[in-house]
Amino acid sequence: MVDVGRVTRTAYAEAFGAVTGRPLIKLPQLPGRAESEIFFDALALNAADLNADGEAERLLEPFSKALAAALAAHQDDLTRQGQLLPGAADAVEAVAKLEGTVATVLTGSSRPNAVLKLSSFGLENFVDFEIGGYGSEAYPKGTLLRVAKERASSKHGVSFGDDATVYIADSARDVDAARIGGARSLAVASGRATAAELRDAGADAVLPDLTDTAGLTALIVRLTAPSS
């Protein structure tokens, strides 16, 4: 929904340095990955000297707090240097207003960081963060999707089966997560993967971008219809 990669990279570098005392020279791939996964890869890539067993795991919580603080310090930069993907704002609002629908996020970010990023662009009122799935929980995304479904069921008192859940994805990895976690996958070729790659991955439906709001909501309705 939002592209804030430049600010996120800056925050990662600041948090990594604060926790390890070493500069972040090599940054792992960020999109689609959990913050914990990125941190452990960064330790390996930057040859951080961790002699004690369990030292990397012990540093994860301080790193998560430092990353949240760094992002908060750069909140104004999120909108100055970042951007909403084309059509994202209208799409999020339209999905939230679909009758019988609850909208949340499944993200590699921690909950505080996800809230910060979306609220910076005015999207916080269209997403129920309470039932989301977050990278700070260190689950694979497929498992994290099941956790989010359970949270939604507990809060709303209804079961969200595989055919009643749509994961709007933008990578082959996310399409796999939808299959594992129990959801229909509506993939958007927003840059991380081509439409052909998303179809080959097995996406239930593919859109070129988020600009066709009516088309997006129509696909969600079709994918969750009893006969689909």
Task: Write out the residue ranges for each language-model feature.
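Active-site neighborhood of HAD-like aspartate-dependent phosphohydrolases
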Residues: M1-P31, L43
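Active-site phosphate-binding/coordination module
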Residues: N46-A48, D53-A73
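Short acidic-hydrophobic, aromatic-tinged amphipathic segments that line or gate anion-handling sites
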Residues: G133, A205-T211
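Substrate-recognition "cap/lid" segment bordering the active-site pocket of phosphatases
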Residues: T104, S109-V166, A172-G181
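Helix-loop "lid/cap" segments that line or gate small-molecule binding pockets
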Residues: E37-G54, A148-R151
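Short, acidic loop-to-helix structural element flanking the phosphoryl-transfer center
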Residues: A73-T104
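Acidic, Mg2+-coordinating phosphoryl-transfer loop and its flanking beta/alpha structural elements
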Residues: Y167-A205
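Short amphipathic alpha-helix with an adjacent loop that forms part of the alpha/beta core around
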Residues: T213-A225
